[in-house]
Amino acid sequence: MLKKDMNIADYDPELFKAIQNETLRQEEHIELIASENYTSPRVMEAQGSQLTNKYAEGYPGKRYYGGCEYVDVVETLAIERAKELFSATYANVQPHSGSQANSAVYMALLKPGDTVLGMNLAHGGHLTHGSPVNFSGKLYNIIPYGIDESGKIDYDEMERLAVEHKPKMMIGGFSAYSGIVDWAKMREIADKIGAYLFVDMAHVAGLIAAGVYPNPVPHAHVVTSTTHKTLAGPRGGVILSAADDEDLYKKLNSAVFPGGQGGPLMHVIAGKAVAFKEALEPEFKVYQQQVVNNAKAMVEVFLERGYKIVSGGTSNHLMLVDLIGRDLTGKEADAALGSANITVNKNSVPNDPRSPFVTSGVRIGTPAITRRGFKEAESKELTGWICDILDDANNPAVIERVKGQVLALCARFPVYG
């Protein structure tokens, strides 16, 4: 028999300890991985609800199982809020992840072997935009575009490649690009060759929702996103469109279910509904503007300390520190900073001579620290500590000093106060 007082601590202390340790790690480490964030207790409450028990294959009003009247309400709330948030006329909130949302778009719009123009992973793209190790690179003919010497997307090259190869689909979006993307220009190029424009806005969805980064939804045929990252919701995906094309919407729905998934995760969809409501609040706009302000403040200190930033700055939530020419790899920088309770990720940079497992760069993002309450002053102070370690990565005394400073700062700004 199930009882309400059942708990993990009594039943599975080994697992409980791991959960507690992760909670402590999050409180005592400064999180600078650009794709990570802290979701609200309301989102976690939704994910821990009895909605997890309900199978709901299909879509609201068209389910394959009975007893779906209340999960229909939940999913409809999520759909309508997503549409309002991004000025869309269509939303599918069922994808379990951003990658599965992307997979559904490929399935809906393309046939295996079709040509796709996507951003080079080494220049800031994403695995699902055509990497040879990903389904996208294995099933489709991928033509990569990249950035120019200034670190900005090369639209002239993009147009030349599009005209030459005539892809059926062009992909906008990135995982490590700090500039503003000209969605209108991309649509102009796509229209010139009769291609679909698909935008993966996963990294900047929160900024877009808040109006501090251009919205691709009015320009693209279809847009996907994760619901975590800057959006600060549960881990999951969403597909959006404002194309006013019912045939396209049907293809997208069919590609998600039954094409790629079975039953939706209703407890996660409830979490998405909560997160979308939170993103519609005025304070969310203040938060996202601060995310950008903090990123710019960090770049300022890196440049003052003599570090190179790919593209020379940032217009969003992330920056890529280029370590080419320094006696320090991205992997070594990642490890040294981690020893001081500062979490980043090694990342390839343009023209990187090192392997993707070693790299010559570090990717840094500000969504999580801003969620804790950091402003420009704390962001600059933190960047100084990072530079201290990068300047002397093999010095245990420097690492220990910075670790102490990090712990004190974390105590001042708890994740969940």
From Swiss-Prot:
Disulfide bonds: none
E.C. number(s) listed in UniProt: 2.1.2.1
Cofactor: pyridoxal 5'-phosphate
GO biological process: glycine biosynthetic process from serine; tetrahydrofolate interconversion
Class of this enzyme: transferase
Record field: catalytic activity: (6R)-5,10-methylene-5,6,7,8-tetrahydrofolate + glycine + H2O = (6S)-5,6,7,8-tetrahydrofolate + L-serine
Single GO MF descriptor: pyridoxal phosphate binding
Stored InterPro entries: PyrdxlP-dep_Trfase, PyrdxlP-dep_Trfase_major, PyrdxlP-dep_Trfase_small, Ser_HO-MeTrfase, Ser_HO-MeTrfase-like, Ser_HO-MeTrfase_PLP_BS, SHMT-like_dom
UniProt entry keywords in alphabetical sequence: Amino-acid biosynthesis, Cytoplasm, One-carbon metabolism, Pyridoxal phosphate, Transferase
Pathway the protein acts in: One-carbon metabolism; tetrahydrofolate interconversion; Amino-acid biosynthesis; glycine biosynthesis; glycine from L-serine: step 1/1
UniProt-annotated site: Plays an important role in substrate specificity, residues: 228
Positions of post-translational N6-(pyridoxal phosphate)lysine modification: 229
Binding site for (6S)-5,6,7,8-tetrahydrofolate: 121, 125-127, 355-357
Family stated for the protein in its record: Belongs to the SHMT family.
Purpose: Catalyzes the reversible interconversion of serine and glycine with tetrahydrofolate (THF) serving as the one-carbon carrier. This reaction serves as the major source of one-carbon groups required for the biosynthesis of purines, thymidylate, methionine, and other important biomolecules. Also exhibits THF-independent aldolase activity toward beta-hydroxyamino acids, producing glycine and aldehydes, via a retro-aldol mechanism.
Subunit composition and interactions: Homodimer.
Name of this chain's protein: Serine hydroxymethyltransferase
Organism the protein comes from: Shewanella baltica (strain OS185)
